[in-house]
């Protein structure tokens, strides 16, 4: 998973 995947909150 990319960093942007985790920032989707």
Curated annotation (Swiss-Prot):
Homology family: Belongs to the FARP (FMRFamide related peptide) family.
Keyword Secreted: yes
This protein's UniProt keywords: Amidation, Neuropeptide, Secreted
Localization in the cell: Secreted
Full protein name: FMRFamide-4
Native source organism of the sequence: Sarcophaga bullata
Major localisation: secreted
Organism phylogeny: Eukaryota, Metazoa, Ecdysozoa, Arthropoda, Hexapoda
Residue numbers of Phenylalanine amide PTMs: 9
Top-level taxon in the UniProt lineage: Eukaryota
GO CC annotation: extracellular region
Entry's Gene Ontology BP terms: neuropeptide signaling pathway
């Amino acid at each position: 998973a990319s960093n942007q995947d985790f920032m989707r909150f």
